[in-house]
Amino acid sequence: MNACVLSVLCLLGAVAVLVEGVTVQDGDLSFPLESVKQLKDLREVQEPRLASHKKFAPRLLKPVAPQLCSQSAFPEALRPLCEKPNAEEILQRLEAIAQDPNTCEICAYAACTGC
């Protein structure tokens, strides 16, 4: 009987962790890992345009944060970072996680919780 109750509690705990998912935290902001993963797709769409500009006028490049934040496909959960003065830096850190989200899923990054 006790083993059955313990098994059910463990199963419920595992389900709770899976439902909540992995959270990425940067300072006072926290984001679902799934939203962070979407940055990679947005960035890949934007890369060809940025690469062509880099060849001709590397000094004229605009910050990436306003461009990403203005896209309609930008994840809603990440919108609060667009208001931050250091949004560019935050996006760079989140994009590093988005490039290899598996390391976050196993909590290799200190910023990832909920594994």
Swiss-Prot record:
It comes from the Eukaryota. Disulfide bonds join C69-C82, C104-C112, C107-C115. One of its GO terms (molecular function) is guanylate cyclase activator activity. Keywords: Disulfide bond, Secreted, Signal. Residues 1-21 form the signal peptide. Endogenous activator of intestinal guanylate cyclase. It stimulates this enzyme through the same receptor binding region as the heat-stable enterotoxins. Coiled coil: none annotated. Residues 22-100 form a propeptide. This is Guanylin. The gene is GUCA2A. InterPro entries: Guanylin, Guanylin_sf. Belongs to the guanylin family. GO terms for cellular component: extracellular region. It is found in: Secreted. PANTHER family: GUANYLIN, GUANYLIN FAMILY MEMBER.
